[in-house]
Amino acid sequence: MTYDHNLASAGVVRAAPPPLVAISILNWDGWQDTLECLESVRRLDYPNYLTVVVDNGSCDNSAERIKAWAHANLGAAHVLADYTQEIALQGGDPRSEEALQRTASLARLVLIRAKENLGFTGGNNLSISYALRRAFAPDYVFLLNNDACLEADCLTQLVDADRQADAAMIGASLSRLGVRRVENRSESGKTRVPNAASTREEFNGFIKEGGRRPPDLENRQISESLKKPSARLDADDDLIPVAWASGGALLLRRDLLEGVKQIQGDYLDDRFFVYGDEAALSLAASKLGHKPMLAKRAIGYHRGMTSTGGHWGALQFYYSTRNTFYGADYLPKFERLRFRLVYPLKSTGRILKYLLKGRPSSARAAFWGMIDAYRGVTGKWRDHDREAELGRRGFLETSRAEVS
């Protein structure tokens, strides 16, 4: 509780305002999901938040549709700050920031237009950089997938959990969209947290196959490196430790973000682009002494993988194969060395399995993921097979000549 010095002498105590939370939502050619997510945010009962939407280089006029929604739904006194990437990285426009600060949470929105698709890592790094460089920097950043919807008290539960347990990194309890909870349990009476976080045994690092969790040796190594007891998802505790927390609905305290940036140069490891980055962030947080936690009472619903068509394809197999290699950098030295020895064998086995199952596109993606890992290729996926085809036709050389 803080004091107003002008009132303190009169014996009047003024309660501190609730911590400010910047809600970071990424949009990439998915304005329908984003608008549904924004409607969910408007129903939150938490009183002090700033919604930040990063349009990640969309080609479907998403930014204009989001602006139109804001003008139609946020009320006559709303404030919409429409920033370029450059202005956002400066902490926004001072006059707009003042107006945002004076406006109620329900009636303020920041739209940042990225020059290109920066991925999950780059888009959120842009949003976090803007938020923490504002004159009115938030106490927390809440990463929220644009295909997620929240119960009204979700953000309140997350902030309260951190203030009670000093956790710094807390994931919401997410069910697949369409599976509603009843008093934190599904209709069958069993707790459902399939998309929220992972226990030590379930932690699979960065590789999933069609929603399954294969028994990968290298991922067990990542899990075991945490040296934490297993979390029981049916435990009575409202807040439970997990090996990693999903970025689908993840509350991050400012001091944690600043500490991670000091270690690795940015808030999220931008080598990943997408997939596996939140697991790496969880490992980085653990090194700083912060245990990733799951707040069972902070409930949300997540459709999942809408930006990639709703199912696992070549993109996912490429990123999961490549990013597993980079994720090993967060392991202790001995386990990292052991991982490097196992990685090519496991990756080659996975490629052969896809070929035997008649999935050549998945095999090619996993192959290039492994090759690019050793070549140090980071960021957005490059379709090497397509580039080779264009090169054979002479198109690639022509385009390069035109650029130069």
Per-range role (PLM):
Residues E86-E98, L106, R113-R134:
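Glycine-rich, basic loop-to-helix element that forms the pyrophosphate-binding segment
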Residues E39-N48, A72:
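Short, acidic, metal-binding catalytic loop of nucleotide-sugar glycosyltransferases
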